[in-house]
């Protein structure tokens, strides 16, 4: 039976309904500061916590609930005679429900506030109370999530109490919340690239129908702090996103964000199948489509500019899973919404992820994201690339970053004519890309050529210029072939493996 509740919340959503329900069941309500004022102004009978503790708030509100008269009432085990005797001797009343949500550190840490101002949003009293209540969940109901209010109200109505399974679950939510909250604070204060303990603060964004395959369960979690493309996008149309959709959308969006020019990326199974730049969105799309008009079917198309009606009409002609762009003209959106299952995603945030993580069995690999395209670019052959060839070479390197290694991209006039990736040796990747391209001007490679065979193969297809990191002990073999065949070659000094 709940006889006494302590309520202290930053987020006032639903709190009046809960408080009035408790009041209707003769539950004594204790409250603090702004919550006390809010409840009292709305006609709820409430006791100021100072009346309980006999001690006023101090240190600008930093100390309100940190008092034995509060924590003794929360932590006392009701079945423990010694506990109950002690709190009775000390004049402490048991507290049967604790309703607390925390200062919004997750949000405030990203606002334009000073360091000291952000520190003030690190909650101390709230976490202390809810941890105490969660530890004593057999006797105390603890609520930290506004979405749980209704369920608890209904359970009390039906059973006159909250059952032990619910109490345990609510207690578990406390420690789940606190681990994320503390992780965000520790990352804020440490500012270390690779701290001793890796603490991640992510919140469930949605449950997914399934994972990569139908027999795998899945959910999507997003960072509690920061603004990221795959956290802050807006779905304007279509079915719910799947596990594969989100992974593919991430790579497609990162690819188009590489370009200052108008760009389009068509992607399938986490690999670009068509990438192009153009003077207009329509031109970029047409060129990307022509890269591989077969593989684009059932894929994702991303743009780094607003989509217009003409482009939307062309997109609507084929089956696509997703179209993602910074924005859509109203008439373009109207066209795309006619395809009710097509997911239309508005994504305005640029790709800013500073770290990549990969899970292995029993561990997590963490690395800096591959955000550097070139380092010490130098022409290593007798012949130098033309201005247009150099533009295409840079374009190719931007694309090849997002193709599974070993990766080769063949480019002509700002268009990835052939993409070869995921091969266990470089010559196979080169043959795949060159064969797909049919014709092309330049070739980009994500890593060095171990032998001269890639340059030989490129020459057979009329390639005029090559860009690659360099660094092989047999670089001279490739340079010699290029000089003999009249091909220019540029070394970048930066490898772009992708596994």
Swiss-Prot record:
Annotated GO MF terms: IMP cyclohydrolase activity; phosphoribosylaminoimidazolecarboxamide formyltransferase activity
Cellular component terms per the entry's GO annotation: cytosol
Reactions mediated catalytically: (6R)-10-formyltetrahydrofolate + 5-amino-1-(5-phospho-beta-D-ribosyl)imidazole-4-carboxamide = 5-formamido-1-(5-phospho-D-ribosyl)imidazole-4-carboxamide + (6S)-5,6,7,8-tetrahydrofolate; IMP + H2O = 5-formamido-1-(5-phospho-D-ribosyl)imidazole-4-carboxamide
Domain of life where this protein originates: Bacteria
Transmembrane domains' residue ranges: none
EC number: 2.1.2.3, 3.5.4.10
Presence of the UniProt keyword Methyltransferase in the record: no
Alphabetically ordered keywords of this record: Hydrolase, Multifunctional enzyme, Purine biosynthesis, Transferase
Pathway: Purine metabolism; IMP biosynthesis via de novo pathway; 5-formamido-1-(5-phospho-D-ribosyl)imidazole-4-carboxamide from 5-amino-1-(5-phospho-D-ribosyl)imidazole-4-carboxamide (10-formyl THF route): step 1/1; Purine metabolism; IMP biosynthesis via de novo pathway; IMP from 5-formamido-1-(5-phospho-D-ribosyl)imidazole-4-carboxamide: step 1/1
GO BP term, example: 'de novo' IMP biosynthetic process
Sequence ranges assigned to domain MGS-like in this UniProt record: 1-144
Keyword Transferase in annotation: yes
Matches recorded under HAMAP family: PurH
NCBIfam families, alphabetized: PRK00881.1 (NF002049), purH (TIGR00355)
Family: Belongs to the PurH family.
PANTHER family: BIFUNCTIONAL PURINE BIOSYNTHESIS PROTEIN ATIC, BIFUNCTIONAL PURINE BIOSYNTHESIS PROTEIN PURH
Record protein name field: Bifunctional purine biosynthesis protein PurH
Species this chain originates from: Clostridium botulinum (strain Hall / ATCC 3502 / NCTC 13319 / Type A)
């Amino acid at each position: 039976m709940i006889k006494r509740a302590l309520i202290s919340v930053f987020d006032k959503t639903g709190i009046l309904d809960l408080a009035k329900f408790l009041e209707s069941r003769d539950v004594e309500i204790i409250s603090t500061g702004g919550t006390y004022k809010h409840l009292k102004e709305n006609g709820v009978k409430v006791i100021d916590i100072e009346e309980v503790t006999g001690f006023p708030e101090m240190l600008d509100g930093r100390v309100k609930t940190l008092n034995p008269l509060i924590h003794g009432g929360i932590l006392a085990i009701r079945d423990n005679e010694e506990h109950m005797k002690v709190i009775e001797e000390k004049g402490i009343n048991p507290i049967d429900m604790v309703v607390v949500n925390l200062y919004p550190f997750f949000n405030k840490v990203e606002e334009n506030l000073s360091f000291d101002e952000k520190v003030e949003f690190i909650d101390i009293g709230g976490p202390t109370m809810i941890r105490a209540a969660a530890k004593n969940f057999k006797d105390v109901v603890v609520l930290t999530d506004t979405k749980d209010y209704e369920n608890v109200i209904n359970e009390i109505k039906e059973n006159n109490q909250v059952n032990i399974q619910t109490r345990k679950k609510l207690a578990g939510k406390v420690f789940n919340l606190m681990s994320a909250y503390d992780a965000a604070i520790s990352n804020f204060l440490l500012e270390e690239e690779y701290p001793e303990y890796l603490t991640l603060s992510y919140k469930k964004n949605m449950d997914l129908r399934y994972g990569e395959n139908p027999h795998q369960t899945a959910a999507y979690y997003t960072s509690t702090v920061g603004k990221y493309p795959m956290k802050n996008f807006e779905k304007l149309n279509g079915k719910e996103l799947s596990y594969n959709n989100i992974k593919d959308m991430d790579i497609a969006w990162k690819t188009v964000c590489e370009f200052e020019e108008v760009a389009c990326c068509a992607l399938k199974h986490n690999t670009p199948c068509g990438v192009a730049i153009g003077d207009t969105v329509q031109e970029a799309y047409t060129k990307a489509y022509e890269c591989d008009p077969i593989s684009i079917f059932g894929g994702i198309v991303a743009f780094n500019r607003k989509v217009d009606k003409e482009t939307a009409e062309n997109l609507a002609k084929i089956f696509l899973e997703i179209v993602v762009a910074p924005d859509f003209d109203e008439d373009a959106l109207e066209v795309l919404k006619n395809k009710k299952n097509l997911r239309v995603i508005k994504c305005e945030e640029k790709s800013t992820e500073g770290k990549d993580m990969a899970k292995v069995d029993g561990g997590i690999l963490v690395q800096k994201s591959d955000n550097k395209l070139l380092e010490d670019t130098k022409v290593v052959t007798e012949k130098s690339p033309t201005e247009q060839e150099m533009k295409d070479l840079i374009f190719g390197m931007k694309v090849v970053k997002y193709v599974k290694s070993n990766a080769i991209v063949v480019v002509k006039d700002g268009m990835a004519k052939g993409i070869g990736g995921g091969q266990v040796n470089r010559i196979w990747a080169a043959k795949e890309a060159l064969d797909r391209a049919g014709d092309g001007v330049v070739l980009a490679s994500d890593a060095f050529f171990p032998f001269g065979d890639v340059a030989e193969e490129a020459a057979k297809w009329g390639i005029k210029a090559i860009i690659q990191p360099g660094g092989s002990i047999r670089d001279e073999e490739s340079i010699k072939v290029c000089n003999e065949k009249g091909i220019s070659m540029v070394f970048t000094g930066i490898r772009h493996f992708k596994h």
